[in-house]
Amino acid sequence: MRVPRLRRTLLTLGGLVLLWMLFSIPMDGPAAVVNPHKQQFGWDEDSLWFQLERRFRELRPRGCDPGATADIAAALASSQRLVRTVDSRAWNPDAAVFASLEANIFALGPMIGACPQRLGDYIRLVTQTRSAVKRQSQRWDVNQAATRDRMYRLLFGGRAALEEVMLQDSLGSRPALALAEDEPSQTPFTRILGVTIHSGDLLVSRGGGQISALIAVGNDYAGNFSHVAMVYVDEKTSLASVIESRPKSGVAVHPLEDYLADVKLRVMVLRLRADLPALRADPLLPHKAAMIALAAARTRRIPYNLEMDLHDTTHMYCSQVPSSAYDKLGIHLWMGMSTISAPGIISWLSAMGVRHFESEEPSDLEYDPQVRVVAEWRDPETLFMDHVDNVVTEAMLRDAQHNQELTYPWYMLPLGRLVKLYSVTVYALGFSGPIPQDMSADAALHVLSFNAIHTTIKRRVLARAVEFRHEHGYIAPEWDLLHFATRSTGHDLTIGGYLAALREQL
């Protein structure tokens, strides 16, 4: 009697193993992708970054002594004169005044880092520089490489310099909120966290996940933001809602308070310029655009556009929500299109389900001359982690450029397909599953693998950053963190990294 029972058990186990192996056979063929073949921006300024760090080390012992204070005052005054010069007339993007202003902002970084008492003035300088450059850009062709490079160096570069200083702030005085331009608007409004928010405003943010870092860093002009949402303010109640698209839920409407309660490392408020011809003709146009987005979200289910196809509005990624709404009213946002051109990065993203690499990236909306920056909020407590996530992602993408494939263990595919089946079932019931609606199990496992590798490298970088601070007495700047991350890649992925990523995914 025992032999037949043993035989049945062995046959059952053998059948299960065979079935598991059959489910481990990949079904997806090679992805058809569209490469825009643009040039990826590169700073190529490593010597400058380490020179600035050496200068900071030299200035730290002086702190805010009278000589240092006088030097800072003179440098700030010189920079403010340059900002006024920029605002005094029309300039071409290649004008020398912009290079001088960029050099001044970077040179001030070590000085303010060593004497943070003037941090508030440095924040105002960087904010005023951004506003002046954006005013100049109203006359520029933002699709020209020279224009994109100039705006990027001053806006992204200025923010990077400022945040390095903020991280070294020994006084703990770095403010979370930096107000910029109070662009006039006639649409309904509300106030939250010290900022007046109008209907039709755009909220550009950075999430706390690994994929958020990939979205921010992965395009031809690496950025700071990973998500865009649109604000609707009810004209009767002044209650604000946010219309946004997320990978698992698609397009949805949330109260503004719920939006802010979700993990946000930074948020920037953008508003259309009041002097745009379309807004002069109809000052309520932004509110009408918000109403269009709100109606679309409430009347039909719009899944997330995983392929990033700009022309498919039956599915929408986050940027398409405001873009499509404003487009219906004659406002075409993202005057400068975003591109991802590096073959290695394209290979990784295509493994995650992306098929189109010319799109509307959240970070690039800041460079659109049609919008003003109203305010920028950073979480001071997570700013360092934001930078760590960036350098880990950048190091991983450098591996991608050296033909390092993004893979996962073959035996995980059956499990991924079971989770996908569960996700399809709960989507049919009107709920969100762990795998987005249009994402395959194979793509989901590539995402999980990216998250797991990121988690493993990040752990090593953080350990090295602690050693650096103990050794040098200050927080490792981003270029040092990137060095740590680069040295931490290429190791075998640990099961602990997979489990940590899986917990976050579920």
Q: Where are each of the predicted segments found?
A:
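Cysteine-nucleophile amide-bond enzymes
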Residues: 2-506
